[in-house]
Amino acid sequence: MANYLNNTPKVPSLFEEAMLGRIYDEPGENENNKPKTNVVVNATRKWYGKKSTVSTFTATAYNEQGEKIDSMKGYFLEPHVNYDSAKIANSDKAIMYGTYNIIPKAELEERINKQRRERGDEDANLRFDWYVDKVPGRSGIAIHGGRDGDDTLGCLLPGDTLEYKEQVQDYTIKNSKSKKNELFDFFKQYGKQGIKINIGFK
């Protein structure tokens, strides 16, 4: 598989990796030897297209003792990465690597609408089911279906097959809807105590 390597982002130092969560913490290592979350998603950016960034991901579920009980794999497609622009709103670039919580639509709506009501504004109705929370400089970063870099302004598009198109020097993913539904079912089944995503790269 060919890779589009122009504008490949600068690799951070080990200190930056540790600070931003590329060195992943496994559940079960807190003071009570119990997991802080039920699901951990580890995503590693590996391929860079003209308008896209592609990661492999593994979502792992843990029980109350911190033992692995289930897992699933797939791809995420994001927009082209440029870490100088990653924290700029509406930049149409992949978000900054690091560790984030994934929260359901209802939780984010409740937070947003509390602020809107205080201002006397009408409630907002969010479009997607799951969101990546508190992304620096960005808002509305969701996980939803799609095919290529034109289908995302920063969101993560899951899929189960990756294709590189030489003529446009870019990537597409396939079966996004079915992979999205599989991932969301995984979140609903195992993520009642929380979901964390670690985004890193090679």
What name fits each language-model region?
Residues M1-P12:
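Hydrophobic, membrane-inserting alpha-helical segments
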